[in-house]
């Protein structure tokens, strides 16, 4: 039996996205810009470089108000050209 994400979450809830992308200066700004469109707020994402320095991992936490917001952000963050993966 497959459990759906919206069955596990109670809204509003704190939800963290981990975005992996190329180690370019604009990565953090692009991630925050997309998040701001769907969950306006004051964000301080954390950035961790990969061991070889080719990629950065950007973690950003929002207060999600509904499942559609969570799903839309997964999709739009993944559509950023320099992003390789969103968890």
UniProtKB/Swiss-Prot annotation:
Gene3D superfamilies xrefs:
3.30.70.260
What HAMAP family does its record include? UPF0250 (MF_00659)
Q: What is this protein called?
A: UPF0250 protein Ent638_1166
Q: Which Pfam families match?
A: DUF493
Q: Which domain of life is it from?
A: Bacteria
In which family does this protein belong, per the annotation? Belongs to the UPF0250 family.
Q: List the disulfide bonds.
A: none
Cellular compartments per GO CC:
cytosol
């Amino acid at each position: 039996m497959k459990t759906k994400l919206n069955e596990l979450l109670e809204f509003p809830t704190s939800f963290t996205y981990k975005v992996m992308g190329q180690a370019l200066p604009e990565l953090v700004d692009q991630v925050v810009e997309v998040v701001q469109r769907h969950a306006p707020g004051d964000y301080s994402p954390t950035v961790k470089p990969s061991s070889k320095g080719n990629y950065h991992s950007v973690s950003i936490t929002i207060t999600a108000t509904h499942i559609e917001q969570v799903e839309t952000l997964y999709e739009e963050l993944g559509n950023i050209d320099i992003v390789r993966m969103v968890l």
